[in-house]
A protein has these predicted regions:
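Hydrophobic membrane-insertion alpha-helices, especially the h-region
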Residues: 1-14
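Cleft-lining beta-strand/loop regions that shape enzyme active-site pockets
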Residues: 7, 17-29, 33, 37-45, ...
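An acidic helix/loop motif centered on a single conserved Asp/Glu
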Residues: 48-65
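PDZ/PDZ-like peptide-tail recognition elements
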Residues: 56, 68-106
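Polar, glycine-rich mid-to-C-terminal structural blocks
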Residues: 286, 298, 305, 309-373
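Conserved functional hotspot residues or short segments at active or partner-binding sites
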Residues: 339-340, 344-513
Length: 513
């Protein structure tokens, strides 16, 4: 039997050897992929989804390059580009999902939802004919159901008090803001929080900074923590606002891309403003271009923790079916000549966890630097390449507040649900408040400490001793006030103003005056 089987195998091999040799002559390395997909389509034993196989093949091929060269199917590509476009077609609300029901956090002024009467604090029960409340409906699926071409209609059913109210909403163009907050911390210090580098970043930042200048700003704290990047040109425009004429911002170079230098034009309105930039382990890409340019030109102070370490530039390649590839075409280099791209490795995506394990998040001395990648700033200070921007002033992760009570509340999102419950209770009053002093007085009257402890106990079964509450409340109370204050007319500005009381990195920046 063994001999017979062996003979059959040899026969099967020889039967196609001539055709295989012929095919070998007809294709080179880069045509193999097309050829094998064609052969699968024509000759595979079972019916298959060729598109699915093609997508998998492209994804596998790009995985051999670098972590940021990626294939994106049509839906994913559309969502990614919409996120950076500065606007999208939808109904015009912001919401969060503190438990299993979406709560309207913001109704965009002048948007479709405001026009029909949706209100902050409404609970979203249905979108179209689909129940989305109480069923742990995926948040990205909620967003997809609410979005759609401008001019189309969707019915959104909300819960308001004891009422269930359906609203027919005609979708429209909705602005997506990248400046999350902008305000004066004191008489001379302004603060701007930027969430991403979108198409509208330069416009939004210019408007915010002009307002702060008019209010007496002499120093700016620019918060790029958790900003994962976006459009390269927007980072250049922001650098231009701070740097003097001829200062180098960045240069790019790749095997098939000649060296491109980018220098400041000297027309920026913030050249004489003291600057502090806040970064952390999730500050990446275009944010690192900005931070690197400021650091290498000795233009400002970088405070926080080592940034992500993405020093690669991608260009889009679009296909007719709506899918596309983001292909790495160059590396970018800061003015001193350093590339801040961290090494590729099998555990690349787990680098942040490794930093925690190695102690880097708690101790500046644990930051691993490559002594062979040392460079000099304009003033002669030593900086390092090879893995993110290392801040001038290190601020560790604060672990002193992690009591059992606080951790238990975080796991169940008790704080967010409490804030939503407080808004339901005090909706008419909170919705009217539009100044900081009035909001502070109202929050004091709400007796948040006892209200929260009662809520945590009755809703989530989480209790604490008086001693544990005292250890926790110094950090937890400002957070609760910020979450409730966000429901006022002051919105995100109220949140960040109140939260800065427990933001150790921001406190360090203020102290650096």
């Amino acid at each position: 039997m063994g001999i017979v089987v062996g003979a059959l195998i040899v026969l099967a091999y020889n039967a196609y050897s001539q055709k295989r040799n012929m095919l070998r002559v007809q294709y080179g390395d880069w045509r193999k992929l097309n050829l094998i997909l064609d052969q699968i389509d024509k000759n595979y034993v079972d019916t298959i989804n060729v598109g699915k196989v093609t997508d998998a093949a492209i994804t596998a091929a790009l995985a051999e390059l670098d972590p940021h060269s990626v294939y994106m199917p049509p839906v994913e590509l559309t969502e990614a580009e919409t996120d950076l476009a500065g606007n999208f077609d939808g109904i015009g609300i912001q919401f969060n999902v503190p438990n299993d029901t979406a709560i309207v956090l913001e109704v965009i002024p002048g948007g479709p939802s405001e026009k029909v009467g949706l209100q902050k604090g409404d609970r979203i029960l249905k979108v179209g004919d689909k129940d989305i409340a109480g069923v742990k409906f995926p948040q990205d699926s909620m967003v997809r159901r609410m979005k759609g071409p401008a001019g189309t209609k969707v019915t959104v059913t909300v819960g308001r008090g004891n009422e269930t109210i359906p609203f027919e909403i005609t979708r429209g163009k909705i602005p997506m803001h990248c400046v999350d907050a902008s305000f004066m911390i004191n008489d001379t210090t302004g603060y701007i929080k930027l969430s991403k580098f979108s198409r509208t970043t330069f416009t939004e930042f210019s408007q915010a900074s002009a307002t702060l200048l008019g209010e007496g700003m002499k120093k700016l704290i620019f918060d790029l923590r958790d900003n994962t990047g976006g459009y390269f040109d927007q980072a250049l425009l922001l650098c231009d606002m701070f740097l003097k004429k001829g200062d180098e911002i960045v240069y790019m170079q790749g095997l098939h891309r000649k060296k491109d230098d980018y220098k400041a034009d000297g027309k920026g309105i913030l050249q004489d403003i003291d600057l502090t930039v806040l970064i952390n382990e999730s500050t990446a890409s275009s944010s690192e271009i900005f931070a690197g340019a400021i650091q290498d030109n000795d233009r400002g102070l970088i405070i926080g923790r080592r940034s992500f370490g993405k020093g690669l530039v991608q260009e889009p390649v679009y296909f007719s079916d709506g899918s596309g590839v983001r292909l790495t075409v160059a590396r970018f280099y800061t003015p001193s000549g350093r590339c801040i791209q961290k090494p590729y490795s099998e555990d690349y995506q787990y680098d942040i966890y490794k930093r925690y394990a190695d102690g880097e998040m708690y101790d500046a001395d644990s930051i691993k630097v490559d002594s062979t990648a040392a460079y000099k700033t304009v003033a002669g200070r030593t900086v390092y390449g090879g893995g993110g921007i290392i801040p001038d002033v290190f601020v560790p992760v604060d672990t002193t507040r992690a009591t059992k009570f606080y951790i238990a509340c975080n796991k169940k999102a008790t704080q967010m649900r409490f804030a939503s419950a407080m808004f339901d209770k005090y909706k008419s009053r909170l919705s009217e408040i539009d100044n900081d002093a009035e909001l502070g007085i109202f929050l004091d009257r709400m007796n948040i400490p006892s209200a929260f402890r009662e809520y945590a106990s009755s809703k989530d079964g989480i209790t604490c001793t008086q001693k544990e509450w005292e250890e926790t409340s110094e950090y937890l109370l400002p957070q609760l006030r910020a979450l409730v204050g966000r429901y006022s007319k002051l919105g995100e500005n109220a949140f960040y103003k109140m939260y800065l009381n427990v933001d150790v990195t921001l406190k360090k920046a203020i102290e650096s005056d």
